[in-house]
Amino acid sequence: DPAHAEQYHANAEQLMEQLQALDKSFHDGLKTCSSRSLVTAHEAFSYLARAYDLQIIGVAGIDPEAETSVARLQEVSKQVKDQGIKTIFAEPGTNKTMQTLADELQVKLGVLDPLEAQVDPAQDYLAVMQANLQSLRGGLGCQ
């Protein structure tokens, strides 16, 4: 649509600026965290861990539908206790395994949204990621 090329270019520039600001917010917001360990239901947030120097501990590995073994739950439980982790994270909605793990370990259950199923159409990528940042900051003990 050549007639609107100028508007598309302006929109792209605006989005790039917003994404760069979001990246800076994550870098600045996570650099003072007392914990660098991110315990999640699965490793969907590996990209986030790499980008912001966090260690990912996935309870179920990569596949969110995979059954978690007792051995893996014991391994994660040991890491949480040994590292003094205060919050583990699950996706929005009910995740019985993560809630049970949080209860057994007496830690908080935080929420991280991987944007798989957009529940609220008013929430765009930037808003969801800002909410994720706030959840991470609270759960990882950031100043």
What are these regions (language model features)?
Residues 1-143:
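Extracytoplasmic metal-acquisition and chelation regions
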